[in-house]
A protein has these predicted regions:
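Active-site acidic/histidine proton-transfer and metal-coordination neighborhood
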Residues: 1-84, 159
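Histidine-acidic metal/acid-base catalytic patches
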Residues: 43-47, 51, 65-176
Length: 176
C-alpha cells in the first residue's frame, strides 16, 4: 500500500509532495504533514493493525510521504512495527539509491518484495533530471522507465539483491 501524501495545510484537497528543503515554506509544509496528519493517522492505524494481527507494508514510492529509506524508518520508528516496507527496487534505482544497501538498512522491517527493475536513460536525465512527469507511453523521451528484471540491471545485481534479502532474514514472497 501507499502512505498517502497530505496537502500543504488544513483544507487542501490535493497532495503536495515536498522534494526540497528551500525555501523554508517547504519545511513548514513537511512539519505539518508529518506531525499533524501522517504520524497521528499511521500511529492509530498501527494500533488497529496490531489488534487485528495484521502487518501493513508501504511501497516506498515517489509522490508519497514514504518514498525512501529514511522516511520508511521514520514512520516505523514513530508509529510502530505493524508497519513495514513493501520493497520495490524499481522506485529506488531512478532516485539514485542502491537498493541492496537499502535492504541492509531496512533489516527486520521488510514485509513484502516486488521484483521490478527500472533503468535511467542517462542522455534524457542529463538534460531533465529524474523527476520526470512524461507519460509512460512516451518511453523514448522519459528519463527513466520500468523494465523486466534483468533488462535494467544485470543478473549479478539481482543475485546480490536476493542474497542480501536472505542475509537480513527476509523469507517471504517475491512478487513479479
Amino acid at each position: 500500500g501507499f502512505s498517502g501524501c497530505p496537502g500543504s495545510g488544513p483544507g487542501d484537497k490535493k497532495p503536495n509532495w515536498v522534494t526540497c528543503a528551500w525555501p523554508p515554506d517547504y519545511l513548514e509544509i513537511l512539519d505539518w504533514q508529518w506531525n499533524e496528519v501522517v504520524l497521528p493517522y499511521w500511529s492509530k492505524m498501527n494500533t488497529e493493525l496490531g489488534d487485528a494481527g495484521v502487518k501493513f507494508a508501504f511501497e516506498m514510492h515517489p509522490g508519497f510521504v514514504v518514498y525512501n529509506t529514511d522516511t520508511m524508518l521514520r514512520v516505523r520508528r514513530e508509529c510502530g512495527d505493524n508497519i513495514g516496507a513493501n520493497f520495490d527496487p524499481s522506485h529506488l534505482f531512478w532516485q539514485g539509491m542502491e537498493p541492496v544497501e537499502c535492504v541492509k538498512a531496512l533489516k527486520g522491517c521488510i514485509y513484502h518484495v516486488h521484483a521490478k527493475d527500472s533503468i535511467v536513460h542517462q542522455t534524457n536525465a542529463a538534460v531533465n533530471g529524474v523527476n520526470d512527469y512524461k507519460s509512460y507511453g512516451d518511453e523514448i523521451n522519459r528519463s527513466w522507465i520500468f523494465r523486466t528484471c534483468g533488462y535494467g540491471h544485470d543478473l549479478k545485481w539481482w543475485n546480490d539483491f536476493f542474497s542480501t534479502l536472505r542475509m537480513v532474514g527476509y523469507d517471504g514472497a517475491i512478487s513479479i
